Every structure is written in structure tokens, then in C-alpha cells.
Amino acid sequence: MNLMEIVVICSLVLGILLLNRPVTMLAQRLYNRHQFRRFIVRETFYHSVVSRHLVYYNRLGLGEQRKFLFRTWLFQHSKNFRYIEVEQTAEMPILVSAVAVQLTFGLDKFKLNYFDDIFILRDDYHYGFYSRPFMGHVDQTGIYLSWDNFMKGISKQTPNCNVGLHEMAHALAYVNFVTETEEDRHFKKEFPNFSKVARPIFTAMQLDGVKNLLGDYAATNYHEFWAVAVEIFFESPVNFRHELPELYEAMSTVLNQDPLSFISGNTTIIRRLQPATGMASAGIGSAGMASSSITSAGITASIAPAPTSAAAAAH
């Protein structure tokens, strides 16, 4: 191979590398434009379903409601919904998708792209060798939700317990720190700061038996602390901020949204920070996990086929 051939090959490789991101972004814009035309036809139906069930959605302004519904459409159409011993209805995938969008509404990345499959079961179920029934769990094969418990959560029948938010919180951590398949730069940048506040609270709960509104189940391990904190953040923001103000602010920052701003009438996402220029330690340390190993760099990919989530009636 002569010098000219080497130069040509290097130029081609460099050109591919330089064009990859713009081409990918263009393809994504074209895809979203196509999907938006399809979504518009169904927007009224989506609004009717989501507005009946999600208080969060009803507190958004009109522009943000459309953004919310379109994200719900995109999320739904990126997944295979599988129904186990439960009769499928049109509202099921919409509501599950809407809860995922609620959690990620302040973030740029919201599809949880590692997970192709979402399994909806009728009610509590048994998983693996665990003796206690489960309301939901997340593992390599997908996101699992029991429909009965999911509906109780979004209808406020079980105070401070929302299995949809709980499992989506696990899934969000999974795609950012385990598979790293859909990393949100803001979320990964801010998670170490969240952990600086959260870790001492978790440690005090686990080692010293300190009680707070998060409940005993949050002390199981740091995965569950995170997921339970997400539930309380959306379900009881007033009480959360009153009892654990620093943790509330840290959660508001890492998710880039503040539910209390919606309640007070300010329906905009609280901030849009500059993208991170680097990736810091996620600040998650070993918590005696049965299903995963954890390092200071984040949740590492040694997940066994075991759930990362709450057993039924866990908190």
C-alpha cells in the first residue's frame, strides 16, 4: 500500500467519523417528522386517555402537553408490549408510556432504548426463586409491570406507591449506568451530585435505622432507595421537600424538573443546563445487592437474571 492509498483510506475514515453524527441527527429528525404526522391523527385520543389518569399531565401548559403526548407516542412505538394473562386494551401501552415520559420529561433521552419489551401482567406474580410476589421488576429481558398495581398507583389508591414510576426509575438507571445504551448527559453529570446528598441519608437508614417518609423498603439497597425516592418525589412533593429538602432539590436537579413548580402554576421545566463535557463518577457504592455489583463509577453490568425492583406490598 503506497502513501496515496493510505491518505485516501484515512480521509474516508475521517469523513465517515465526521459525518456520522450529522447524518444520524438528520435521520432522527426525518423519523420524528414522519411520526409526528402519524401522531397528530391520534393526538385527541391520547389526550383523552392521559388526561383522565395523570394529574401531572393536566398541570402542564398546552405546548408542553403536546410535547408530552408526542414523547408518549414515540416511546410507545419504540416498544413491544406483551400481555400475560391480562386482556389488552388500547389505553394500556399509552398509560405505561406516559408514566415513563413523566419521569424523563426534563431529560433529552427518554426512550429507555435498551428495553425493547414491556411485559404487562394481570396482578402480583412470582419471579424466579423469590417467595414473595412482585408488583414489577426490571431485568435484561425487559420491564415487567402488574396492571392492577400500576392502575392503583396512578389513581392514588396506594399513597406514595406508584409501581410504574418505580420500575421506570430502575430502567432509567439501567440504561445510563449498566448498558450505557441511552445515556442522558445531564442525568449522568448530575447523578454524582444527587448521590452526595442521597448516600448519607441511605446509609443512616440502612445502618442506623433512621426513619423518614421514604419508608423501610428504601433502605434495602441503593437501587431501591433511588426508585422509592422517585416515587415520593412525584407522589408527595410537598411532604418530600418539607422533610428532606436537600434530597428533594438534588432529585429536582438530576431529573431537571420540579413537580412543585407545576402545582404553583409554573408549568415549565425548571432549567436546561449546558451539556456535560465529561463523565464523572456516578457516586454509587456497594449496597449488598443480590442482583448486581456496584462501583463508584455507576451500576456495572454484572446483572444476573434477577429483579432490581420491589416485591408486592414492599412499602
Identify the residue ranges that each predicted region occupies.
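N-terminal signal-anchor transmembrane alpha helix of single-pass membrane proteins
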Residues: 1-32
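A metal-dependent hydrolase signature that marks the N-terminal structural subdomain at the beginning
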Residues: 25-133, 247-261, 268-278
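Glycine-rich, often proline-containing surface loops adjacent to acidic residues and nearby aromatics
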Residues: 79, 139-148
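Hydrophobic (often cysteine-bearing) scaffold residues that line and stabilize catalytic clefts
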Residues: 92, 157-161, 223
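Metalloprotease/metallohydrolase-associated module, dominated by Zn2+-dependent proteases
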Residues: 96-105, 125-139, 153-155, 178-282, ...
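Short pre-active-site segment immediately N-terminal to the catalytic Zn-binding motif
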Residues: 147-163
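Active-site recognition of the HExxH zinc-binding catalytic motif
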Residues: 159-175, 227
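Ser/Thr/Pro-rich low-complexity tandem-repeat tracts
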Residues: 276, 281-286, 291, 296-297, ...
